């Protein structure tokens, strides 16, 4: 059987079905939501996770286009196939806008729908025009109206850290969405998608009966590709990639899992893969970083700086209650809600007794992409050279040549210009953590707690554990002596692996040259 073409970049369900492109069947979720209690629904998922395709699937379903669903789950589930009037608003292109631009964007979105419904003399205000659209569609068809709003929060993402501008744009959006509550009797179904969760009072005014399905277990796999969908529905794709990479099926699946899997939006939850990355990987026949290449997380970097969130804070994992990460981003007191809702961390476990979730970076692609995005903020113009150094270090560490790897690092630091705002130990610890975190073949832990204190950096390979202490303005010998005096290595005595202690130091010479040094001993 010939392999179907992947719909990379395509978000229109009707086009995908008409052109017979590859499609993962999510129609059971569409039927479930359309036949549950409630009128208003909201779903938060990271970008490039299939939200737009889900909305256009719903559009075709509510328009009664039964022929598009031949062979899909919903074909057997739905008996009536009633056609409803659908108003579909796409806010995904409403980014990087001032208030006047946003108002013109609303005008364009409304005008498109007004032309469809024959409204020739619309009112001026956006909310009045939306009311008129709903009333006209209801009157012309005699049926309740379906409203689908894609990426409702797109205009706000870039200004989430600018209070004054955020409030201005938020007020305009509140005005636009205000008719949704008052027109309830005329509405069959309202569905909004987005990346972040803004508080209901801030945008949706009196719309206090919206059902947020983002963390509901029945909808855990509504977007993305679950492991079952991959293994049972894409075996030929995995085999083709395995042949290209000269790997076994099992090895290829493990690589896909390591790079693109790891998402969970509730607990328990199936393993969910990033669909854009997975399909792009199959199309290009190459495992690479695709998600970060499709968009720069500028707003995230800005927010990390605003909240003084350090790279090391990501660590191995973090524990939090639901309200700490599934929270409105405009009122957040930590960056955790933005990290979670944007897809940079995800749920890994849940403890019923404490009601605490364990959160962590989902996979290798996100880890590497995130740390590479952070690197320029610590090393300015030397990022490219640092990436080259890291790649060479990784090879040497695999060969258990730690001293040669650190010699490369020493040579690199000699090229880094000194700045006054880097004259403290924390700067070098965070930079070193990013560098070691990008050594993705190894397990890296920063500031690991032991009974005697905290180890600055721990690096674990297949056969060796490196216990590292970092000092600024002191000697590498002093750093090594702290490892000895506080018995940091004792924590790994039962690991069965070789343990190497590494003391590292940074000093600034009179000519402002950065001097990196180290000493190491084996146990």
Regions found by a protein language model. Give the residues of each.
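Metal-dependent nuclease catalytic cores in nucleic-acid-processing enzymes
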Residues: 176-183, 337-345, 431-437, 482-502
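Active-site metal-binding core of divalent-cation-utilizing nuclease and nuclease-like domains
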Residues: 136-141, 435-462
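Structural motif
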Residues: 146, 464-466, 500
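Phosphate-binding site recognition
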Residues: 1-424, 439-440
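Domain-level recognition of nuclease-like catalytic cores that cleave nucleotide substrates
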Residues: 491, 495-523
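Conserved catalytic cores of phosphodiester-cleaving nucleases, focusing on short active-site segments
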Residues: 432, 455-472, 486
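Mg2+/Mn2+-dependent nuclease catalytic core
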Residues: 167-171, 472-489
């Amino acid at each position: 059987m010939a392999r179907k073409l992947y719909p990379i970049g395509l978000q229109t369900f009707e086009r995908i079905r008409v052109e017979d492109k590859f499609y993962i069947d999510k129609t059971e979720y569409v039927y479930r939501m359309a036949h549950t209690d409630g009128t208003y629904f909201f779903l938060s998922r990271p970008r490039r996770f299939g939200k737009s395709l889900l909305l256009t699937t719903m559009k075709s379903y509510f328009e009664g286009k039964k022929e598009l669903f031949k062979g899909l789950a919903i074909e057997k589930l739905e008996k009536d196939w009633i056609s409803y009037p659908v108003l579909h608003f796409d806010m995904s292109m409403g980014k990087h806008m001032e208030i006047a631009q946003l108002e013109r964007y609303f005008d364009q979105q409304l005008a498109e729908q007004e032309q469809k419904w024959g409204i020739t003399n619309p009112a001026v205000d956006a909310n009045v025009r939306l009311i008129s659209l709903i009333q006209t569609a209801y009157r012309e068809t005699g049926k309740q109206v379906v409203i689908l709003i894609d990426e409702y929060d797109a205009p706000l993402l870039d200004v989430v850290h600018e209070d004054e501008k955020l409030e201005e744009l938020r007020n305009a959006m509140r005005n636009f969405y205000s008719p949704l509550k008052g027109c309830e009797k005329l509405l069959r179904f309202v569905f909004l998608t987005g990346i972040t969760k803004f508080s209901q009072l801030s945008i949706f005014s009196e719309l206090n009966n919206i059902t947020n399905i983002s963390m509901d277990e029945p909808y855990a796999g509504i977007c993305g590709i679950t492991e079952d969908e991959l293994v049972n529905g894409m075996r030929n794709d995995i085999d083709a990639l395995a042949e290209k990479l000269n790997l076994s099926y099992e090895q290829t699946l493990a690589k896909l899992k390591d790079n693109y899997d790891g998402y969970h939006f509730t607990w328990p939850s199936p393993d969910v893969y990033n669909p854009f990355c997975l399909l792009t990987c199959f199309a290009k026949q190459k495992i690479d970083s695709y998600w970060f290449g499709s968009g720069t997380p500028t707003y995230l970097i800005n927010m990390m700086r605003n909240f003084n969130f350090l790279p090391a804070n990501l660590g191995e994992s973090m524990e939090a209650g639901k309200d700490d990460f599934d929270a409105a981003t405009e009122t957040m007191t930590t960056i955790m809600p933005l990290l979670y809702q944007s897809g940079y961390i995800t749920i890994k476990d849940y403890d019923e007794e404490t009601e605490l979730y364990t959160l962590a970076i989902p996979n290798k692609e996100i880890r590497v992409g995130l740390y590479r995005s952070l690197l320029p903020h610590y090393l300015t113009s030397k990022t490219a050279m640092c990436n080259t150094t890291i790649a060479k270090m990784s090879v040497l560490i695999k060969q258990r040549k730690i001293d040669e790897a650190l010699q490369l690092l020493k040579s690199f630091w000699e090229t880094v210009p000194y700045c006054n705002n880097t004259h403290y130990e924390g700067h070098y610890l965070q930079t070193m953590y990013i560098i070691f975190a990008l050594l993705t073949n190894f397990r890296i832990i920063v500031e690991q707690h032991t009974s005697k204190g905290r180890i600055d950096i721990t690096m674990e390979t297949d056969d060796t554990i490196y216990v590292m202490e970092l000092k600024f303005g002191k000697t590498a010998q002093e750093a090594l002596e702290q490892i000895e005096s506080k018995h940091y290595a004792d924590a790994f005595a039962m690991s069965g692996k070789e343990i190497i202690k590494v003391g590292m130091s940074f000093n600034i010479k009179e000519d402002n040259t950065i001097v990196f040094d180290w000493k190491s001993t084996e146990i």
